[in-house]
Amino acid sequence: MCGILAIIGKGKEEALVQQLSKRMSHRGPDESDIHVTEKGHILAHERLSIVDLHTGKQPIQGTDSAWMVHNGEIYNHKKLRETTLKHHTFRTTSDSEVIVHLYEEFGYDFCDMLDGIFALVVIDGDDYIVARDPLGVKPLYYGMDERGRLYFASEMKAITDQCKSFSTFPPGHYYTEKTGFVKYYKPEWEAHEKAVEKLDLKALNASLTQAVEKRLMCDVPFGVLLSGGLDSSLIASITSRLLEGSGQELHSFSIGLDASAPDLVAAKKVADFIGTTHHEIHFTVEQGIEILDKLIWHLETYDVTSIRASTPMYFLSKAITEKGIKMVLSGEGADEIFGGYLYFRNAPSVLDFQKETIERVQKLFTADLLRADKSTMAHGLEARVPFLD
């Protein structure tokens, strides 16, 4: 995970762009770099190294004139290298590099080939494409200044004082000057009338296990968030099972006001049962109040629910990174997919239940995913969400 900034248009001072990018340095504490293209467009990148620690520095150049920046993870990058892109020469072993080569091979029509989470910008001369992953796991914003230059950034704080207007980049879309916004992600589940498959627990188990397994792709220490609820407990249990025989220690993390908090008690039971090395983090109400200004700066919202839910995650993320861990698996999305919230029981009909779950998943990027990303990335911690595979 990282922070990206791209400016389409000439005349912006490189030193200023570096300062703007540094506003997101918490997202990428490992490396920082900038590239000015021959046409005067600018790409900047703040890197949190998870895959290819030594040669994965960005911006990354393609075979010729195309350059790119990417925030996220491409889980099928090895398969793409060995099949679709087998005739291409790669400069790195980074998962991100496949993006620029897919652009070289297919032009704009490559986003649906990516299995992963991403906010990306590719610039080739005066041509460019900007895209965001299907559900908006990774944040992306765009704006325009008074001279008509376009800005794209992982966080609003990098561009707000440069743009006369800015907005959220829609998930599941790409944007080019020639096409405008194009919706590339068109899943069947968005049409409620197609929900005709019967429950298949074996298929569900296999699908979730596969989703967890692909998210273990990393070259750094990782762990699992564990609240003791069904969603995080499933993720932790599957991860533990996948690591059996590897000799790798799995760390689990939970947080609460004190050891008697219900979530901590439940999480401890799960951790003991599946055999993780468990860590309990405690914080006080006073500590929560003290960090409110800083938390709001990171979240970029005054929404009360988001701030309340992000407070423990902010403290937990800090404690996790202090133990040298850079990536965690989390249970976001399960309640929306399966109707886990209490109010779902009041659905007037099966159809209304189905429509509500669809809408909740579609809107995850406005709340839960935003909170999960920004409260963890405030401390350079990457959260991966298998339920949203």
Model-derived regions, located:
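Cysteine-centered catalytic environments shared across enzyme families
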Residues: M1-T301
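Short aromatic-hydrophobic micro-motifs that form the base-stacking/packing surface
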Residues: M68, L329-S330
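Conserved glycine-rich, hydrophobic/aromatic-active-site segments
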Residues: F110, V212, L295-M327, G333-L388
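Short beta-strand "acidic-cap" motif of Rossmann-like dinucleotide-binding folds
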Residues: S252, V328-L329
